[in-house]
Regions:
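Conserved N-terminal beta1-alpha1 strand-loop-helix module at the mouth
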Residues: 1-74, 94, 143, 154-155, ...
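Distinct, well-ordered alpha-helical segments
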Residues: 42-47, 113, 134, 160
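Hydrophobic secondary-structure block in the mid-to-C-terminal portion of proteins
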Residues: 134, 139-200
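Glycine-rich beta-to-alpha transition loops that act as phosphate-gripper elements at the mouths
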Residues: 8-11, 59-65, 81-85, 101-106, ...
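Glycine-rich phosphate-binding active-site loops on the catalytic face of alpha/beta enzymes
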Residues: 78-88, 121-130, 165-185
Length: 200
């Protein structure tokens, strides 16, 4: 899953439209943030709709143990966190669920990987130099898969990959909560296609 779409505040009932858009555009991984209303039921519904199409459905913004428990119970296929928390990383790794914790400093990147992270999410990367920061981290951390997150959009996505990011994740630049609430999946699809085309 080199590219992950972040669904924050996706409304209940939009799952089929979301999956249809992902299939149409070629997106293979989506995550629902756990601070979204009805996150667990949305994850379960998305997973049911996405499974026939080979789209992975995960949980994001997993900050506490209870979030992880709910995400796993809902059927999340991977876990993403905004920070480096020992408990979440270890429990996910023990459960053999791919875990991508958030980190920012070199110390956090190494710590997250040592604890069992599948990859490490550099967040918020746009606030600390963007692609140049990924390039700087890539030097000493050649063995650690890095995900760029924070401000990733069609204009800069390719730059992150060129700088050494293995994975990209994006939220409001594509999955704008207002567009999802309005059911404007056509505009979302247009933005998503533009981003995916930029990294082909």
């Amino acid at each position: 899953m080199p590219v992950v779409g972040i669904l924050r505040d996706i409304p209940r009932g939009a799952e089929e439209a979301c999956v249809k858009t992902a299939v149409e555009c070629g997106l293979k991984a989506i995550e629902v943030t756990m601070n979204t209303a009805s996150a667990e039921s949305i994850i379960a519904a998305l997973k049911a709709a996405a499974k026939p199409h080979g789209i992975a459905v995960g949980a994001g913004t997993v900050r506490h143990g209870i979030d992880l428990e709910k995400a796993i119970a809902a059927g999340a296929e991977f876990i993403v966190t905004p920070n480096t928390r020992n408990e979440i990383i270890r429990l996910s790794a023990t459960a053999r669920i791919p875990i991508i914790p958030g980190a920012l400093t070199p110390t956090e990147v190494q710590k997250a990987f040592d604890l069992g992270a599948t990859a490490v999410k550099i967040f918020p990367v746009n606030c600390v130099g963007g692609p140049e920061y990924i390039k700087a981290l890539r030097g000493p951390f050649r063995d650690i898969p890095l995900m760029a997150c924070g401000g990733v959009n069609p204009e800069n996505a390719a730059s992150y990959l060129k700088a050494g990011a293995n994975l990209l994740s994006f939220g409001a630049s594509i999955y704008d909560p207002k567009l999802m609430a309005a059911g404007d999946w056509a505009t979302i699809a247009e933005r998503l296609k533009k981003l995916l085309k930029s990294i082909q």
